[in-house]
């Protein structure tokens, strides 16, 4: 045998033997698989032996036979000795709570239905998935029972896995038990081992900047969710969270022990009573980055259906902020809103006094403010406008139950929650309960600062939007703005607070115009930091006047993360398209095959043009086109284009 052939055999053995050993380590009867309805996703679960009696749970995920998640741990970390002692249950002595769980059964089911949201990015949403429930038991003996109270050292846990064509999600579920099981969750073992060479769009906090970083060298830093990743084979992956209502916020940290591995990092511990389900951990994969955007309904599908009996009062729309807290100035804002096709006026912080003082009373107007809110509500209603107010969480925590009936009596339509604390179990539960209560009084909600959505607006659609984004309050550049559609907006609506005339904006006016089509927010704040008198009849602002804030259909047509985005949205028969580029100029060819075949349209096109002798330098073009025509958009650096297609009769 020659040396070359011998080297090849040795190399083959080095590759095969570890694989065989791994296969032998998998415990008999624990391997379970689940595929998506179209067969693209394959989720594989199994347990490996740890010592003589224990086991560790693992999973892998492939997409079209390409590795997405390599062998990764599953599990929940529970420290239950105090509860067990109080209940007279023998203490659990396992190093990791999940290590002696035994798989006792598996249930499978399928679902395929279509539902209509109260509002959204699409008029109908298909909810189609395959589901697998893995059932586990911890403990053996029947133990002692006292007066009907079960003192057996038995615990039960399920892992529920759903495979959609849009992605895969799993969660931990603790069934109800006769011993009224208390659980003190101190962490999760949930991890995501990515292919070597994966890059992450790292974001340290919800309103922070993004950085494309390898899965190494993060130290103790954590990244926000959603976390979008670029795999070395070109796939785009997003890790998200769904139905986080009374749990704690999860972020992502790097494993100290295993390369290219992300771990779920919980904000703090959680105390629960069974039955209880943890939030869904969601994995989406796209061959193109825009596939992630087009599949974002998965987050809503993982949440319960609407629980409000009457939703007729919930009216999405555009919002103008009034920072001038004087009666006549708010009236001027209402007049401007009525003129410019805006549905709401928002009275910002300070109307009831210094917002950061616990003594400020949000049931009354500050003595130094010339404001009569009930009279303003009546004036706004006469103009077809709704009035909303800002209230800091400091006042909400103390006065919420008093404020809600009062604000309804005044005629207010909504509240913006300000400087909301979010992360631990207490504040997560409080916040979602506050949204529920607002729904009982017919008040819409916009949550500001660090809160990020996980689909609660399906269940309580009076939660219209939320910040949790580096928007125009931070004045980000075009690079940041072209990352957002592929990251933050995957989780749901975001209140970016669109600016237009403000001189601190770093991007072109056409870039800002396009945001109204690219960025989804059922309450879309426009002209942030502007005043009514700033408007001088600019023709391009007819785009903002015409555009709605919710849609019958939405399609991300083209783009690359941090480079550019082309987003099309339909309301009725009209289509609106926004194109945005990063800090580099580029030419984008737009094929209008999203339009109805055989129909002709009038196109209103708004583009940057530095040659114009106007202050906004936006060129307006109006021309007839037919479905399928190609349009060449020359986007200026940090620029964009806004397009409105209206069918011709």
Identify what each model region corresponds to.
Residues 123, 144-146, 202-210, 605-628:
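Solvent-exposed beta-strand/loop surfaces of large extracellular or lumenal domains
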Residues 134, 531-576, 611-616:
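Glycan-recognition and catalytic regions of carbohydrate-active enzymes
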Residues 1-29:
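Bacterial Sec-dependent N-terminal signal peptides
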Residues 561-597, 641-642:
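Carbohydrate-binding surface patches
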Residues 349-508:
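Aromatic- and carboxylate-enriched substrate-binding clefts and catalytic-loop regions
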Residues 623-649:
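C-terminal beta-strand-rich structural cap/linker in extracellular carbohydrate-active enzymes
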Residues 276-344, 348:
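An acidic-aromatic substrate-binding cleft motif
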Residues 25-302:
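N-terminal accessory beta-strand-rich subdomains and adjacent acidic, glycine-rich linkers
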């Amino acid at each position: 045998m020659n040396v070359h052939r011998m080297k090849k055999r040795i190399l083959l053995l080095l590759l095969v033997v570890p694989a065989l050993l791994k296969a032998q380590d998998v415990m008999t009867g624990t391997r379970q698989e689940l595929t998506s309805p179209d067969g693209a996703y394959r989720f594989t679960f199994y347990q490996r032996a740890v010592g003589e009696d224990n086991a560790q749970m693992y999973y892998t995920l492939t997409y079209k036979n390409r590795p997405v998640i390599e062998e990764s741990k599953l599990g929940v970390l529970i420290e239950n000795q105090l509860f067990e002692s109080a209940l007279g249950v023998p203490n659990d002595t396992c190093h990791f709570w999940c290590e002696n769980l035994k798989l006792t059964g598996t249930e499978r089911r399928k679902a395929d239905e279509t539902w209509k949201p109260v509002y959204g990015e699409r008029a109908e949403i298909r909810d189609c998935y395959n589901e697998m429930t893995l059932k586990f038991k911890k403990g053996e003996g029947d133990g002692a029972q006292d007066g009907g109270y079960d003192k057996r050292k038995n615990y039960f846990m399920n892992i529920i896995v759903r495979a959609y064509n849009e992605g895969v999600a799993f969660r931990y579920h603790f069934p109800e038990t006769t011993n009224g099981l208390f659980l003190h969750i101190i962490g999760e073992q949930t991890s995501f081992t990515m292919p070597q060479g994966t890059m992450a769009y790292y974001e340290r906090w919800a309103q922070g900047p993004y950085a494309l970083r390898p899965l190494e060298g993060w130290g103790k830093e954590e990244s926000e969710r959603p976390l979008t990743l670029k795999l070395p084979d070109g796939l785009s992956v997003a890790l998200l969270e769904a139905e986080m209502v009374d749990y704690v916020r999860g972020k992502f940290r790097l494993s100290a022990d295993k390369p290219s591995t992300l771990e779920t990092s919980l904000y703090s511990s959680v105390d629960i009573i069974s039955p209880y389900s943890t939030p869904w951990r969601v994995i989406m994969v796209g061959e193109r980055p825009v596939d992630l955007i087009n599949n974002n309904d998965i987050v809503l599908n993982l949440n319960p259906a609407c629980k409000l009996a009457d939703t007729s009062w919930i009216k999405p729309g555009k919002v103008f902020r009034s920072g001038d807290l004087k009666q006549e100035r708010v009236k001027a804002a209402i007049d401007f809103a009525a003129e410019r096709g805006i549905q709401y006026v928002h009275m910002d912080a300070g109307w009831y006094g210094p917002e950061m003082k616990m003594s400020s009373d949000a049931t009354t107007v500050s003595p130094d403010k010339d404001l009569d809110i009930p009279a303003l509500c009546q004036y706004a209603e006469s103009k077809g406008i709704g009035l909303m107010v800002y209230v800091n969480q400091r006042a909400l925590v103390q006065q919420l139950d008093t404020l809600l009936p009062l604000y309804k009596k005044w005629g207010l339509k909504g509240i913006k929650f300000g400087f909301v604390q979010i992360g631990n179990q207490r504040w997560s539960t409080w916040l979602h309960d506050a949204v529920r209560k607002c729904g009982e009084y017919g008040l819409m909600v916009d949550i500001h600062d660090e809160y990020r959505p996980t689909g609660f607006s399906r269940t309580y659609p009076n939660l219209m939007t939320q910040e949790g984004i580096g928007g125009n309050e931070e004045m980000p550049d075009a690079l940041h703005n072209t990352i957002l559609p592929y990251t933050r907006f995957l989780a749901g609506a975001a209140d970016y607070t669109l600016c237009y005339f403000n001189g601190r904006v770093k991007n072109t006016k056409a870039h800002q115009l396009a945001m109204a089509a690219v960025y989804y927010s059922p309450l879309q704040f426009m002209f942030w930091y502007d005043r009514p008198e700033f408007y001088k009849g600019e023709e391009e602002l007819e785009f903002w006047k015409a555009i709605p804030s919710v849609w019958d259909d939405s399609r991300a047509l083209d783009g690359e993360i941090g480079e550019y985005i082309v987003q099309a949205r339909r309301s009725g028969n009209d289509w609106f398209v926004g194109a945005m580029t990063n800090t580099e100029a580029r030419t984008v060819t737009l094929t209008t095959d999203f339009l109805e075949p055989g129909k002709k349209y009038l196109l209103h096109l708004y583009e940057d043009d530095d040659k114009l002798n106007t202050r906004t330098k936006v060129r307006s073009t109006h021309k007839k086109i037919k479905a399928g025509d190609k349009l060449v958009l020359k986007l200026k650096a940090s620029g964009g284009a806004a397009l409105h297609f209206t069918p011709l009769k």
